[in-house]
Amino acid sequence: MTPLLLVTSPPLSVPAGKLLERYFPGSTLLVWDPACPQDKRRVHRRIMAGRWALSLSFYNDYIFSAAELAHLGCILNIHPALPSLRGRGYDTLPLIQRHTHFGVTLHLVDEQIDTGKIVEVERRAMPDAVEYPQFRTLTQQLSLSMLESLLQRTQALPAAELSGYWISRAQCCEARWSGDFLSSQGLSVLLRGLSEAEPNHPILEQLPEHLLLQPA
């Protein structure tokens, strides 16, 4: 059984892969590119061909099937937002809704999206007058910092405790998910509504075009 599997996506697949190799050389890195239609099948085949004691999902929206979950052991996901922001919109809603804080959430993965028990939360004050590109960079940096901390602590564990340690951490954590889940379609509807109600909203000029053109 391979100790670790890391499933991630661009744009953080390269730095995430380097961290994995630093702390767990020889572990399995799977990079899922949602822009490539065949990629999901490739990732699925690789997951079904192995078994892992501990699996990490990092900065990607890959949804694991029940069959895949059975091969992944204990699964941890680093969600690039606070528990109050479930689903998509983690790098846009805090700006649109003028949140005072942002953060990242480490949680166990189950068959639902962003419902697994929370292990820990990193929370930061929102900088003044921050714009979308800078905010996205901040969340990515904080996500990578949490990934490195996770790998450091896991490296210090005996092999037999790779999963049990993180499950026990989740049982002790008091943080809970809150708020409604926002899908990709829901985010598209929200952005279209914003462009109609406030066409001069500054974030509309900062967002990449593909977010604004997604079908509702």
Feature map (PLM): residue ranges:
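Short amphipathic alpha-helix with an adjacent loop that forms part of the alpha/beta core around
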Residues: 39-51
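A short beta-strand-loop structural module common to alpha/beta enzyme folds
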Residues: 26-41
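Short, flexible loop segments at the rims of nucleotide/cofactor-binding pockets, characterized by
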Residues: 31-35, 52-56, 82
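C-terminal active-site/capping subdomain that shapes the small-molecule cofactor and substrate pocket
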Residues: 15, 188-216
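A short, Lys/Arg-enriched amphipathic alpha-helix followed by its capping loop at the start of a domain
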Residues: 15-27
